């Protein structure tokens, strides 16, 4: 039998600088039910900005 993937869900991290840049990652919904916010590098404006979680369509 194949092993289940579990509670990990793919998410998109969208730049708060409104550049349209985003990262994709996975997170465990059981351990982290709140929306993820993380500071990452935005190569469009070449600065570190806050990235906020959005659903992948």
Swiss-Prot record:
HAMAP family: Ribosomal_bL33. Belongs to the bacterial ribosomal protein bL33 family. One of its GO terms (cellular component) is cytosolic large ribosomal subunit. This is Large ribosomal subunit protein bL33. PANTHER family: 54S RIBOSOMAL PROTEIN L39, MITOCHONDRIAL (PTHR15238), LARGE RIBOSOMAL SUBUNIT PROTEIN BL33M (PTHR15238:SF1). One of its GO terms (biological process) is translation. GO terms for molecular function: structural constituent of ribosome. Transmembrane segments: none annotated. InterPro entries: Ribosomal_bL33 (IPR001705), Ribosomal_bL33_CS (IPR018264), Ribosomal_bL33_sf (IPR038584), Ribosomal_zn-bd (IPR011332).
């Amino acid at each position: 039998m194949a092993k289940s993937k579990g509670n990990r869900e793919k998410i998109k991290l969208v730049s708060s600088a409104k550049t349209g840049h985003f990262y994709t990652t996975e997170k465990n919904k059981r351990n982290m039910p709140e929306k993820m916010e993380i500071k990452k590098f935005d190569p469009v404006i070449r600065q570190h900005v806050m990235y906020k979680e959005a659903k992948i369509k």
